[in-house]
C-alpha cells in the first residue's frame, strides 16, 4: 500500500484512516467519548474539505493503533455526522494549537 495521507513524516494508509474514522464515528453515534474524543471540530483554520456538515475530530495514531485513550498525539482524522471523511490534519508544523492539512496522495 502507499500513503493516503502523510502527516509530518508519518505515512498513513487508507486502512489506518478508515479504522480511526470508524472508531470515532462509532463513539459519535453512541454518544460516548474516550478522553473527550471525538469532539466537535470547528475548522477555525478554514480548510477546504470535500464534504460539508458539522465536523468531528478523532486522533489517528502514529503507531497505527486505534486510539483508546491517553495522549492523542498530533494527528486527527476529521469526519462529519454522515460518516464521511473530511480529511486528515496535524499539529505538526503548525503554530500553537493550530492544525495544518496532511498531504494526500
From Swiss-Prot:
Keyword vocabulary terms for this entry: Disulfide bond, Endonuclease, Hydrolase, Lyase, Nuclease
Disulfide bonds: 3-11, 7-102
Gene Ontology terms for molecular function: lyase activity; ribonuclease T1 activity; RNA binding; RNA endonuclease activity
Top-level taxon: Eukaryota
UniProt xrefs under SUPFAM superfamilies: Microbial ribonucleases
EC number of the protein: 4.6.1.24
InterPro entries according to UniProt: N1-like (IPR000026), Ribonuclease/ribotoxin (IPR016191), Ribonuclease_N1/T1 (IPR051386)
Catalytic activity: [RNA] containing guanosine + H2O = an [RNA fragment]-3'-guanosine-3'-phosphate + a 5'-hydroxy-ribonucleotide-3'-[RNA fragment]
Active-site residues, as the UniProt record annotates them: 39, 57, 91
A Pfam family per the record: Ribonuclease
Family: Belongs to the ribonuclease N1/T1 family.
Entry protein name: Guanyl-specific ribonuclease Ms
Species in which this protein is naturally found: Aspergillus phoenicis
Source taxonomy: Eukaryota, Fungi, Dikarya, Ascomycota, Pezizomycotina
Amino acid at each position: 500500500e502507499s500513503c493516503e495521507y502523510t502527516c509530518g513524516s508519518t505515512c498513513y494508509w487508507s486502512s489506518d484512516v478508515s479504522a480511526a474514522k470508524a472508531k470515532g464515528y462509532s463513539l459519535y453515534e453512541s454518544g460516548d467519548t474516550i478522553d473527550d474524543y471525538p469532539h466537535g471540530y470547528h475548522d477555525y483554520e478554514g480548510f477546504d474539505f470535500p464534504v460539508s456538515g458539522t465536523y468531528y475530530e478523532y486522533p489517528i495514531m502514529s503507531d497505527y493503533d486505534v486510539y483508546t485513550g491517553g495522549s492523542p498525539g498530533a494527528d486527527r482524522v476529521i469526519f462529519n455526522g454522515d460518516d464521511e471523511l473530511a480529511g486528515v490534519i496535524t499539529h505538526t508544523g503548525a503554530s500553537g494549537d493550530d492544525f495544518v492539512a496532511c498531504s494526500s496522495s
